[in-house]
Amino acid sequence: MRSPRTLEVWKLGTVNYLKSLKLQEKLVSERKAHQIPDTLLSLQHPPTYTLGKRRTDHNLLIPESELTKIGAELHYTQRGGDITFHGPHQAILYPIISLRSIGFGARNYVETLERSMIEFASIYGVKARAGNKCETGVWVGDRKIGAIGVRISSGITSHGLALNIDPDMKYFEHIVPCGIADKEVTSLRRETDTLLPSEEVIHEQLVSCLAKAFSYDDVVWKEDPSLILDTQDKE
């Protein structure tokens, strides 16, 4: 009989991308040292483009110098994947979890992230699917609704998933999302006829779907972001 699994979830609101990256690095180090339990960051970012390890420059369709004019930042990262947009009105989840402790390999981990978003979409009557061989993320037909880009270091995960609730779609016009040409991007707002609740509720629902998919027995919600963000600033 396995021991109970607990997931600690931090609701962080809107966080600058680099600040969240530094926080993830700190938490990964602490998880490796068994100083913290499996942890999940639930947040949004100001408009930000990130490039993963499979990046190709031609998938950013405007000069980097033009990004400030549209109010966006660009950052190079060590996650998997190509170029992705992160911004307001997305549900972004960054799991910092030990794959060894839950008995998952890398592929099973990514597939479970996909299932989490698919299960969430079904709450609103949206039939989503995992990407095919040349696709990444989660799709509704041929339209992409959720992106996945992860990093695994010594069995500890970081980065994660971004699901489109109702982002400004103009930001996607400046990139080839995840390096896949000729595909549309969509959102929960566009795909459902259901009246959407607050984004806080949507974040909580997505977290619950993820916790269920990974068979966590308990979710501990942390409601005060200053407790983790302020500690980071003091170090």
From Swiss-Prot:
The site (Lowers pKa of active site Cys) lies at: 144
* UniProt-annotated binding residues for substrate: 79-86, 147-149, 160-162
Q: Which CDD domains match?
A: LipB
Q: What keywords are assigned to this protein? A: Acyltransferase, Mitochondrion, Transferase, Transit peptide
Q: Which GO terms describe its biological process?
A: protein lipoylation
- Report the domain of life of the source organism: Eukaryota
Q: In which pathway does it act?
A: Protein modification; protein lipoylation via endogenous pathway; protein N(6)-(lipoyl)lysine from octanoyl-[acyl-carrier-protein]: step 1/2
Reaction catalysed by this chain? octanoyl-[ACP] + L-lysyl-[protein] = N(6)-octanoyl-L-lysyl-[protein] + holo-[ACP] + H(+)
Mind telling me which GO cellular component terms the entry cites? extracellular region; mitochondrion
Q: What is its EC number?
A: 2.3.1.181
Q: What class of enzyme is it?
A: transferase
Extract the InterPro entries matched here.
aa-tRNA-synth_II/BPL/LPL, BPL_LPL_catalytic, Octanoyltransferase, Octanoyltransferase_CS
Disruption-associated phenotype? Embryonic lethality.
Check the record and name the Pfam families matching this protein: LplA-B_cat
- BPL/LPL catalytic domain span: 34-218
The GO terms this record gives for MF are: lipoyl(octanoyl) transferase activity
Task: Tell me where in or outside the cell this protein is found.
Answer: Mitochondrion
Tissue/organ expression: Expressed in leaves. Expressed in roots, rosette leaves, cauline leaves, stems and siliques.
**Residues annotated as the enzyme's active site:** 178
Q: Which PANTHER family does this entry report, sorted A to Z? A: OCTANOYLTRANSFERASE, OCTANOYLTRANSFERASE LIP2, MITOCHONDRIAL
Instruction: Give the misc comment.
Output: In the reaction, the free carboxyl group of octanoic acid is attached via an amide linkage to the epsilon-amino group of a specific lysine residue of lipoyl domains of lipoate-dependent enzymes.
- Similarity-based family: Belongs to the LipB family.
Described by its record, this protein's role is as follows: Catalyzes the transfer of endogenously produced octanoic acid from octanoyl-acyl-carrier-protein onto the lipoyl domains of lipoate-dependent enzymes. Lipoyl-ACP can also act as a substrate although octanoyl-ACP is likely to be the physiological substrate. Together with LIP1 is essential for mitochondrial protein lipoylation during seed development. Required for the lipoylation of mitochondrial 2-oxoglutarate dehydrogenase component E2 proteins in leaves and roots.
Q: Tell me what this protein is called.
A: Octanoyltransferase LIP2, mitochondrial
Its lineage reads: Eukaryota, Viridiplantae, Streptophyta, Embryophyta, Tracheophyta
